[in-house]
């Protein structure tokens, strides 16, 4: 009879990366602690943190606290009863973006189902503060589904991010097991309404694979996203954060990810990043529209 350890799939070589903890990375981590800020890069144990913080000048801040009101079975973020909102957080995030000299910033948040506005007002204020202090930094937001609250979504989109990112995470069949407090159709509705509110802002979603889905289900999910006018797709390998989380059912090869990307582009996505270590914010600075890219170029000119 197989033991628990034998049941866990062996991680393939292409998922083994060398961590480069340089002075830049160490300094940024120290600054985050001094300012009492959180990044999903750290909380979700992202394998790309060194590349993003160092070479690409991108980072993903996690606001509204460090405790999520949901307990999705794939996610490493702490769950439980959150603290009160920190109304000074928007200014601290904006200041940190400036000190880090970021080219592109992703602002995500824990789900705050305990709040009447789902945290949308502080979220929108964070976008505005970052924009005020960093006019050449492109901003991507990665919110929860806001409990399906349309007014909360309106508040978010009125802050005019450069990208709206909301993750489908997995295929329809697996959604109840993977993220019980969310629904597949509510995610699609959230993405569609975002585009209706601000048609010129690109929308984006991300899919984890390796949870037991079929290739046909992956392609059906692509079709559902395109039917709701989603522009950008990222696809990455699910990695089990701990023994308490869902186990990996399959490790996809780089060749299989290449095929997924090819199919996604054929289905009409403007951008698709697909690979074993791809995460929702991976190479996000490349995915903004032309107007936002011009803003990035102006910022580069000021640095030189």
UniProtKB/Swiss-Prot annotation:
It comes from the Bacteria. [4Fe-4S] cluster 2 binds at residues 68, 72, 75. GO terms for cellular component: cytoplasm. It catalyses: [[Fe-S] cluster scaffold protein carrying a second [4Fe-4S](2+) cluster] + N(6)-octanoyl-L-lysyl-[protein] + 2 oxidized [2Fe-2S]-[ferredoxin] + 2 S-adenosyl-L-methionine + 4 H(+) = [[Fe-S] cluster scaffold protein] + N(6)-[(R)-dihydrolipoyl]-L-lysyl-[protein] + 4 Fe(3+) + 2 hydrogen sulfide + 2 5'-deoxyadenosine + 2 L-methionine + 2 reduced [2Fe-2S]-[ferredoxin]. It is found in: Cytoplasm. Binds 2 [4Fe-4S] clusters per subunit. One cluster is coordinated with 3 cysteines and an exchangeable S-adenosyl-L-methionine. Gene3D superfamilies: Aldolase class I. Residues 54-270 form the Radical SAM core domain. PROSITE patterns: RADICAL_SAM (PS51918). It holds the Pfam family Radical_SAM. The keyword DNA-binding does not apply. Residues 282-304 are annotated as: Disordered. Its EC number is 2.8.1.8. [4Fe-4S] cluster 1 binds at residues 41, 46, 52, 281. Its cofactor is [4Fe-4S] cluster. The keyword Iron applies. One of its GO terms (molecular function) is lipoate synthase activity. Keywords: 4Fe-4S, Cytoplasm, Iron, Iron-sulfur, Metal-binding, S-adenosyl-L-methionine, Transferase. Pathway: Protein modification; protein lipoylation via endogenous pathway; protein N(6)-(lipoyl)lysine from octanoyl-[acyl-carrier-protein]. InterPro entries: Aldolase_TIM, Elp3/MiaA/NifB-like_rSAM, LIAS_N, Lipoyl_synth, rSAM. Belongs to the radical SAM superfamily. Lipoyl synthase family. This is Lipoyl synthase. It comes from Staphylococcus epidermidis (strain ATCC 35984 / DSM 28319 / BCRC 17069 / CCUG 31568 / BM 3577 / RP62A).
């Amino acid at each position: 009879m197989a033991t628990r350890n034998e049941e866990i799939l062996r991680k393939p070589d292409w998922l083994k990366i060398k961590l480069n903890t340089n002075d830049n990375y160490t300094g940024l981590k120290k600054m985050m602690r001094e300012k009492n800020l959180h990044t999903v890069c750290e909380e979700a144990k992202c394998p790309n943190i060194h590349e993003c913080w160092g070479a690409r000048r991108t980072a993903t801040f996690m606001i509204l606290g460090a405790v999520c009101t949901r307990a999705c079975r794939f996610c490493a973020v702490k769950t439980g009863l959150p603290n009160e909102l920190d109304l000074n957080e928007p200014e601290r995030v904006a200041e940190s973006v400036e000190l880090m000299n970021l080219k592109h910033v992703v602002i995500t948040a824990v789900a705050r189902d305990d709040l009447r506005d789902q945290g949308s007002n502080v979220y929108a204020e964070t976008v505005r503060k970052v924009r005020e202090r960093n006019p050449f930094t492109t901003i991507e937001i990665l919110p929860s589904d806001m409990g399906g609250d349309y007014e909360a979504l309106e508040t978010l989109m009125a802050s005019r991010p450069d990208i709206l990112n909301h993750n489908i995470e997995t295929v329809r069949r697996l959604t109840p097991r993977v993220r019980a407090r969310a629904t597949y159709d509510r995610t699609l509705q959230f993405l569609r309404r975002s585009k209706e509110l601000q048609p010129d802002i690109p929308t984006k979603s991300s899919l984890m694979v390796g949870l037991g889905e079929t290739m046909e289900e992956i392609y059906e999910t692509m079709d559902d996203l395109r039917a709701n006018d989603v522009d950008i797709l990222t696809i990455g390998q699910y990695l089990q954060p701990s023994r308490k989380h869902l186990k990996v059912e399959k490790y996809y090869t780089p060749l299989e990810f290449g095929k997924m990307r090819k199919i996604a582009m054929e289905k009409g996505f403007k951008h698709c990043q697909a690979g074993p270590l791809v995460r929702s914010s991976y190479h996000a600075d490349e995915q903004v529209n032309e107007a936002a890219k011009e803003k990035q170029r102006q910022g580069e000119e000021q640095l030189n």
